[in-house]
Amino acid sequence: MMKYFISLSLIALIGLNSCSEPTYPSEYSNQVVVQGYLMANQPIDSIIVRRTARLEEYVSEANLAINGAIVIITSNEINGIVDTLKAMPGNPGFYTSTRNPQNIIKPKQTYTLFVRTPDGRTVTATTTVPDTFHIIAKETFPRVIYYRKGPVVDQTKPYIIDWTSSSMHSDYITSVTSLDSLADQIPRDFGNNNEEKPNRTSYGFNYIDKTHTEIPWFTFHYYGKHMLAILAIDNNYYNFIRQANSGGTDIREIKYDVIGGLGVFGSAAMDSLIVTLQPN
């Protein structure tokens, strides 16, 4: 799940200097960009290390990747983990844990990311993982739902998902992942249906500050089987997406919870359920 976790953040970062006010090639600042997320009760996923892009250059994973970096994740507990990540073959700029057995991320634990690039630049960041929670009455939630229709007992009302509270400070977002690669795309209300197909995973950036929400229909792009997830996100990721989504000239005022570079090193706890979406 984490490899899909809101990857648009890196898109915003690598193109940072192309936003807002006019920018000239001479103003380019080569900075290290990191992106990584830890998921409670899951093994360490990949950390991405790249550089910022010049305004005039072709942007790709390969030419922005920083290879040969030292990437380490540590925990602050006594006898905690020290995991040196290794480069992922065929994925420039991606680093992953090769430990066996795997290190499992603990809820309510604090972790630090350390990155040193081949040219000696150092980037660090720290995240405290939200506590776990669970969706209430998951077993009785309908396994088949109809697009933009409510429960059978009253189809004019929305489906509501309730969950227990993450005991630490957390805001929540929703994610919807299509699990059926052959499922039909939901016709768009606006635009051209011949446009590029949407991603299989989409997110509702509604910063839910309570423990219930309506089913977010706008995040469904396909019919068929889906994983509907609730994520409790840490302060780092909340701060980043709250600022990045503001748009306009505010993009230059983003404050990163990263020392020595740009990016986001965040964490989350998640619970999910599986539903099949049928046409209305």
Task: Identify the residue ranges that each predicted region occupies.
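Sec-dependent bacterial lipoprotein signal peptides
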Residues: M1-N17
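A sequence/structural signal for flexible, mid-protein segments enriched
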Residues: C19-N280
